[in-house]
């Protein structure tokens, strides 16, 4: 799950086709959980520097269920889409934060995406 999400979020940042995976179609459906108009506000609330990736912990939004976890993935993907170039961004911190927030729901996410763990 971690590798899939890393590849997906990096792909959303620059659309590098070498990162593309058919599973991304399923993950892109999560975009509906975050309004495009909210992305600028979310970025502002993250107080990001030019080299930051999505810093979800700065949003102070708890992850209490699978829907919250899906929303965090969608926020990460949409913010990644709208921020600087991949090579300039410190992704490791962003992924550490994201996974710490949603790892409890990895099994549920796998079932939701694939129908099994």
Curated annotation (Swiss-Prot):
<protein>
    <recommendedName>
        <fullName>Protein OPG035</fullName>
    </recommendedName>
</protein>
<dbReference type="GO" id="GO:0085034">
    <property type="term" value="P:symbiont-mediated suppression of host NF-kappaB cascade"/>
</dbReference>
<comment type="similarity">
    <text>Belongs to the poxviridae OPG035 family.</text>
</comment>
<dbReference type="Pfam" id="PF06227">
    <property type="entry name" value="Poxv_Bcl-2-like"/>
</dbReference>
<comment type="function">
    <text>Bcl-2-like protein which contributes to virulence by preventing host NF-kappa-B activation in response to pro-inflammatory stimuli such as TNF-alpha or IL1B.</text>
</comment>
<keyword id="KW-0945">Host-virus interaction</keyword>
<keyword id="KW-1119">Modulation of host cell apoptosis by virus</keyword>
<dbReference type="GO" id="GO:0052031">
    <property type="term" value="P:symbiont-mediated perturbation of host defense response"/>
</dbReference>
<keyword id="KW-0899">Viral immunoevasion</keyword>
<dbReference type="GO" id="GO:0052150">
    <property type="term" value="P:symbiont-mediated perturbation of host apoptosis"/>
</dbReference>
<dbReference type="InterPro" id="IPR043018">
    <property type="entry name" value="Poxvirus_sf"/>
</dbReference>
<dbReference type="InterPro" id="IPR022819">
    <property type="entry name" value="Poxvirus_Bcl-2-like"/>
</dbReference>
<keyword id="KW-0244">Early protein</keyword>
<keyword id="KW-1100">Inhibition of host NF-kappa-B by virus</keyword>
<dbReference type="InterPro" id="IPR009353">
    <property type="entry name" value="Orthopox_N1"/>
</dbReference>
